[in-house]
């Protein structure tokens, strides 16, 4: 499971012009599910997202997690994070999980974040979405449940 995590001052996702999810201060998480991911990957990623200290404390040091700043999380599914462009110029997506399995794990991550008391907004799985954000910092972190980076 891969995630691009961005600290945002605001973010929203639209489908057919309608806002399906929006947050103010918080995290925008672009989430890709791999073919061999399972419940353990979802748990690891949810735990890491909730605990990730990328918000500044009073001293200006990145020392606070999203809940500690009253932030929310916008999670958007993005299978293209599993794209492989090592050969040729068109990425292949064979490492991405099939839609049914990917959706189940995407929903699991969102549910686990909610269980931790976080407000979670989402996009629409498999929809053509437009994501708008203001990256605060900018701060962007790459996470991988297999710790590849």
UniProtKB/Swiss-Prot annotation:
Origin: domain of life: Bacteria
Residue span of motif Gly-cisPro motif, important for rejection of L-amino acids: 137-138
Gene3D superfamilies: D-tyrosyl-tRNA(Tyr) deacylase
Nuclease found in the keyword field: no
InterPro entries with a match to the protein in the record: Daa-tRNA_deacyls_DTD (IPR003732), DTD-like_sf (IPR023509)
tRNA-binding is among the record's keywords: yes
Keyword annotations from UniProtKB, A to Z: Cytoplasm, Hydrolase, RNA-binding, tRNA-binding
GO biological process, any: D-amino acid catabolic process
Catalytic activity: glycyl-tRNA(Ala) + H2O = tRNA(Ala) + glycine + H(+); a D-aminoacyl-tRNA + H2O = a tRNA + a D-alpha-amino acid + H(+)
Enzyme class: hydrolase
Subcellular localization: Cytoplasm
Function: An aminoacyl-tRNA editing enzyme that deacylates mischarged D-aminoacyl-tRNAs. Also deacylates mischarged glycyl-tRNA(Ala), protecting cells against glycine mischarging by AlaRS. Acts via tRNA-based rather than protein-based catalysis; rejects L-amino acids rather than detecting D-amino acids in the active site. By recycling D-aminoacyl-tRNA to D-amino acids and free tRNA molecules, this enzyme counteracts the toxicity associated with the formation of D-aminoacyl-tRNA entities in vivo and helps enforce protein L-homochirality.
Assembly notes: Homodimer.
Notes on the domains: A Gly-cisPro motif from one monomer fits into the active site of the other monomer to allow specific chiral rejection of L-amino acids.
PANTHER family reported in the protein's UniProt record: D-AMINOACYL-TRNA DEACYLASE 1, D-TYROSYL-TRNA TYR DEACYLASE
Official protein name in the record: D-aminoacyl-tRNA deacylase
Organism, scientific name: Anaeromyxobacter dehalogenans (strain 2CP-C)
């Amino acid at each position: 499971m891969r995630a691009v995590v961005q600290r945002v001052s605001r973010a929203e996702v639209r489908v057919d012009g309608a806002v399906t999810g929006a947050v103010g201060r918080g995290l925008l998480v672009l989430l890709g599910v791999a073919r061999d991911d399972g419940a353990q990957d979802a748990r690891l990623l949810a735990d890491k997202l909730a605990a990730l200290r990328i918000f500044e404390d009073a001293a200006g040091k990145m020392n606070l997690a999203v809940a500690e700043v009253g932030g929310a999380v916008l999670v958007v599914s993005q299978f293209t994070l599993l794209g492989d462009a090592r050969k040729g110029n068109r990425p292949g997506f064979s490492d991405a999980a099939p839609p049914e399995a990917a959706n189940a794990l995407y929903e699991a991550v969102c549910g686990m974040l909610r269980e931790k008391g976080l407000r979670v907004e989402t996009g629409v799985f498999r929809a053509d979405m437009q994501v708008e954000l203001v990256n605060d910092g900018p701060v962007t972190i790459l996470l991988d449940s297999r710790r590849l980076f």
